Amino acid sequence: MKPSPIVEHDHVDGPANAPLTLIEYGDYECPYCVKAFPVLERVREAYTGKLRFVFRHVPKSGQAFDKQAAEASEFAAAQGKFWPMHAQLFALDGRHDLEQLVTAATAVGLDAAACRKALLERSFAERVRELSVAALHSGIIGTPTLFINGVRYENRIEEPLLKAAIERALAASGS
């Protein structure tokens, strides 16, 4: 299993020439993704300048608002606010309804009425569907799934374990 190459529409944080690339396939309603979020945030901060982080949606829970949370993040992305919205959605602890999604959008400076309209009209549904299909084509069947420099991370998402894997990847890259 390999992640697909990073493309223009991916959600990327960090320098393109970073020696490390960490890709997360995740879902805003997955309890394991919610638990992993603060660990990944601390790792991103610890490796600032050395790490390029990519988040890819894999809405899988089947809950009513599962895909809608991903759509809300895409609405935010269209306005340059993906990462703040990403944090807001994980802060909701996997519990989303339309009003919570709109509130999250306003918390990051987005227009409530525009967000509500985009979600009700499913303006970003096709984008989320395409991302889900791409993840399936890459062999992703569960969340969270992580790759460090293209190699699947197979351990628990705990800070010391993840940092050890990152350090090994850094050493292997010669950085």
Spans of features found by a protein language model:
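N-terminal targeting signals for export/organelle localization
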Residues: M1-S4, S175
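A short beta-strand-turn-helix
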Residues: P3-L20
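Generic hydrophobic-segment detector
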Residues: S4, G62-Q63, A70, A125, ...
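Short clusters of hydrophobic/aromatic residues that line enzyme substrate/ligand-binding pockets
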Residues: V12-D13, H96, Y153
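Structural alpha/beta surface segment adjacent to cysteine/selenocysteine redox centers
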Residues: A18, I23-T106, D111, R116, ...
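C-terminal cap of thioredoxin/glutaredoxin-like
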Residues: Y25-G26, Y32-R44, T103-S175
